[in-house]
From Swiss-Prot:
Keyword vocabulary terms for this entry: ATP-binding, Hydrolase, Nucleotide-binding
Protein's UniProt name: 5-oxoprolinase subunit A
NCBIfam families attached to this UniProt entry: PRK05406.1-1, PRK05406.1-3, PRK05406.1-4, PRK05406.1-5
InterPro entries documented for this protein: Glyco_hydro/deAcase_b/a-brl, LamB/YcsF/PxpA-like
Catalyses which reaction(s): 5-oxo-L-proline + ATP + 2 H2O = L-glutamate + ADP + phosphate + H(+)
Species for this entry: Burkholderia vietnamiensis (strain G4 / LMG 22486)
GO biological process: carbohydrate metabolic process
Protein family (similarity comment): Belongs to the LamB/PxpA family.
Job of this protein: Catalyzes the cleavage of 5-oxoproline to form L-glutamate coupled to the hydrolysis of ATP to ADP and inorganic phosphate.
Gene Ontology molecular function: 5-oxoprolinase (ATP-hydrolyzing) activity; ATP binding
Keyword presence, Transferase: no
Pfam entry (one): LamB_YcsF
EC number: 3.5.2.9
Amino acid sequence: MEIDLNADLGEGCGSDEALLDLVTSANIACGWHAGGANAMRDCVRWAVQKGVSIGAHPSFHDPENFGRKEMQLPPGDIYAGVLYQLGALSAIAQAEGGRIAHVKPHGALYNQAARDPTIADAVVSAIHDFDPSLSVFGLANSVFVAAARHAGLVAIEEVFADRGYRADGTLVPRSQPGALIDDEDAVLARTLDMVRERQVRAVTGEWVPLNAQTVCLHGDGPHALAFAKRIRAALETAGIDVIAPGALQAGEDA
């Protein structure tokens, strides 16, 4: 059994280089919700050095709200914004001897694309037109995953170890009770359930089936690094290989 571990990096949380020793895929902020050119370059360089798969983490242009405020934009604006961010990170990756392998939207863009076909299609179209060999990371069982596959892209279904799920497979909004799970032992157990049993218990008690192909490790908490080490160790102890999806790795030629 195999699983990918990914983390959102370049967002000013301070533990990026160390997290890259634990994850197999890095989603690098492209400057619109956090980070900037220097942070992007640092993360790409470290990813190339450590053999971690490089991904773009585009968002709405909303640094004031860390990209977590939902926006209603024309599809053309979303398309252009995603293209813009992919171009920026791709240029830096090329200069550092790597290349982008995947794309994972951030925050509100991620959540809206997961349920809104119009937004999903705009994001997918931008990725496809930029480079149809790129894979996408999206919420397991979501509209976004379906849209990507319909467009011929490889879609990697993502699960969240420390987030609450609703019975329909969507994430509990951060503003609601049960959105974030702080108990580390509970998160470890949930991670193994999602990876081995292909299911997660919703906040209302139901078991929700899902196809876990990559697990997101959040890197923005005070204990994020230590906890990431526990999750990776638990997976390896359970005999699960931690490996990036696909053959395209940072620093390799396609």
